Amino acid sequence: MAERLELYKCNVCGNIVEIIHGGEGTLVCCSLPMEKLKEHNNDEEMKEKHAPVVVMDGDNKIIRVGTIEHPMQKEHYIIFIEAISEDKKYLKRKYLCPEEAPEMDIQKCDYNKFIARELCNLHGLWTNNSIKKTD
């Protein structure tokens, strides 16, 4: 059963879909079942460039991708960064383009504990499940 906010990808055409309302059945694209994107969060080899982290920049709180800045070229970039409230009722997402800084301002998020996720076009979905927004 597909659940809210899960991401699925077609391995033929590259379409990516997000579940808005979970249900039974199999998601199909190009006549084949779609693959659920696995959430990476502990792959030490790539974690430094992919795991979302919250940092302070003066008075601003931002989510950055990795402790070492992620490349942002046409061939390899972050598609989006998002913050999801712990109860999964609220979501803030920023879509990125190549050459744009891989970060998102979360100053105006009203939820204190949230999940941060980002999607890399080459290395998939990365998650940090236990972020607390400090005032």
Enumerate the predicted regions with their spans.
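Intrinsically disordered, low-complexity linker/tail regions enriched in polar/charged residues
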Residues: 1-12, 21
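Residues immediately within or flanking Cys/His clusters that coordinate Zn2+
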Residues: 7, 16, 26, 117
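Short cysteine-rich clusters marking metal-coordination/redox-active sites
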Residues: 10-13, 29, 120
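Cysteine-rich micro-motifs
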Residues: 23-34
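Short metal-binding segments enriched for Cys and/or His
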Residues: 34-48
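Exposed aromatic-hydrophobic patches
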Residues: 63-65, 101-109
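Short amphipathic, basic-aromatic surface patches that mediate peripheral association
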Residues: 65-73
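Short acidic/polar inter-strand loop motif in beta-rich domains
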Residues: 119-129
